[in-house]
Each structure stands twice: as structure tokens, then as C-alpha cells.
């Protein structure tokens, strides 16, 4: 018995998670069948093989593997006359696996997670550990332009729900030896893969350390909702502050530009959006179309977006404030006052239309394309003549709120759009309560929220305004011509 035990330890050194020795092959296979759910999960396949006269078993998830490639590998294994001279699983991989990436995996739990991630696991009688083949091929949609970030010129591709394809889209654009695509697996039940993409030597090392630390100690059962779940887990906890701490993009060209500027792009498997870090409020004014037009036109578009952002936040509160204080209006501005008689208070009308617009947005997301025309007609009737004739709304409210609703789409970030919306509604309520003092209080609260917003790491939410950086600020305020220094 002692001799047998010594011989077994010489051929298969002890590693955690596996049964050892030839006599334990059936126990090892049975345990892996149990862990992988063979017989209970219709998509999990277990297959018995004979490799060089030895028992072997292979596990793979149907729909994950490249079947032609896997069949060629298996056919080559089964044609082997013997495995004389092969010392362990790592030696087997070096000698007899050339069609795809393969590695010996001594840890059982890691091997099982690999199968769930699309890899193929094989165990061979007499070898410690298992052979893990990377022959996966995930089902995915084709690369196409995102619906929400279209451009008139430039590339018309977008990220998909496959991490490897998204990484390839970045690598295709950045052919630089300093580009790093660092892959991490989150420590939660779903084992989601995440990639940190950055330029070595240019990205903030403090940001990278903070990201790795937070991602590898993330306390979640799963990342079912993908990038938003991760964003909430890594961002500072300020649930009361509506201003976004993370930017998103579905465009590889935007992500590439951020990487080249020293930012960090976080790709999440099963997500077609990338996270852009660090985030400052002035970065939300940038838009990809600015850089597909000449500098003068790009600068004009940036100015327009800045004005629209300010108008969407302040136009209805200022109008409501002036209507409440008609004596402050010059005679030439009296047309701003409400001309028709109304029964519903203006504050109720304004807040009601704010809510109705959001209801229509939510409904439009769930409306089939076939019914979209009918939905548009119904929405126009609700916020059109019927509402005015029924004395629910006055025409002035509809005009200003229609402008706000349309102008809000000039902001490409949904999160920033809703942050300005919440601040606008807060201003309306404070003006209703305290008039001019309420307006002043609303401005102070809004500025306080912006100043106290905490990015994950970096120089602050108001950078490059505070701390002041003239070159960075100038770049964000207007579109500079491309030169050797700033290209």
C-alpha cells in the first residue's frame, strides 16, 4: 500500500481539488459530472473517449464550442497509439494540442468555471489535473452602428456583447506596443469577465490601482445588469447626487480616443457599452461628431450644446419665476405672461408635463415598431389640442416643455440628461415655495451637488476648471485644429 501511494504521488503531485491516480479516474469523472450538471442541464455535454489506450472524458457546453475545430482535436487524440513518455497534463498539451490554445489546469474549481465560460475540459486517466481547451465561440450579433450614437461621417461600427470582439475593435485602431488590455474575472457567482484598456505610461496609475482593488473585491451576487452594476459598485456612494460619475459609450472610436488621451476604458462581457474613466462634468460636453467636422463647425456645435444644456435646466424655472412676478417684466416682455385663463396651477402643469414626457419615453421603449405611428399620434393628442381645450394645460407650458423635451436629446448622456431634469424640477418646486429666494436656493443646491460630486479617483469633478488647467480647459471648450502637438 505504501509503495502504491508513493508511486501515485510521483506521477501526479498533489494539487487541490482533484482525485489522484489511475484508480480514482471514475471518482473524478463522477464528481465533475455532478458539479457541471451533466444529465440535469440539457446544454452540458459529457463524452467518454479513449486516448492512447487510456480512459478519458470531455465536457463542453453546447453552443459555445467551435464544433469543427473540436472534432479535429478529438480525432487526433483518438488516433494516438499510446501515451508513453507523456508525464502529465501539461506535457500532453505541449505534444498533442496545436489546433487551439490549451493549458493544464490543476485546480478543479477553476477548470469548472472555465467550462461555464465556454472552454472545453478533458481529463485523462493517470494524469493529475485536467486539460482545458480554448475552442469557444459565443453566439453574438454582427457589428453595427449604435442607434443612439450615430455620425454623419466616420466609422459606422459599434461594440457588441462579446468581450473578445470588443477588444479586437480597439486593437484594430490602436496598433501600439503600449496598449494594455488587462483581463479580470469578478469574484461573484456569474464570474463575469472585465477588461481594463489603457496606454501604459499615460494612464493614471492611481486610477488603475483603485479600479483593480474595487473590481477584485466587488461584493455582489452577480453582475446581471452588466456595466451599470459595476459602475455603482466602483463609484463613490452618493445616491443623493444625480450627476453621473461614469461615462458610457457604444462606439469603438470614442473609446479609442479616450485611451489615447490617457483615460481607462472598462469593457464588460455581455455588454455593448464601455465605461470611460475618469469622469468630469465638462467631459459630457464632448461629442464624436465635433471631430468629424472642421474645427470651426466643431466649435459651433460645442457652443450650441452648452447653451442647450443651460436652457434645458433654466428655461422653465425662469419663465415660471417671471410669471409669478409680472411686475419685474419690461413692457416689451409682457408677451411671456400667460394670456389665457387657466384653472390648474402652473406649477402643477409644469410638473405634470415633466412626468407625462417621461411616461411617453418609457412607453415608446416598449412599443412595437408596427404601432409606433399610432403611439406618436396618441402622444400628440394627449399633449396637444385636447389638453388645451380641456383647460388642463395652457399653450405656453406646452411650448416651453416641448422645447425642453426636444433639446434634452442634444445631450448624448442619458444620465446627465436626467440629472439636469431633476435639478430643473427642484428649481420649480423651490420657486413655487419661496419665489426669488427659492430660485437662489436652487442655484446654490445645484452648484453644491456639482462641487461635491466625487469621481472614482482623479483631480475632481470640475477638472480642468478646478484645479485650473488652461490647456485642458481650452480643449474642452472649443475644437482645436489638429496639429502635431495635440494629435
Predicted regions and their residues:
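Hydrophobic alpha-helical transmembrane segments of membrane transport and translocation systems
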Residues: 395-397, 401-487
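Long alpha-helical, hydrophobic tracts
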Residues: 142, 155-158, 175-178, 182, ...
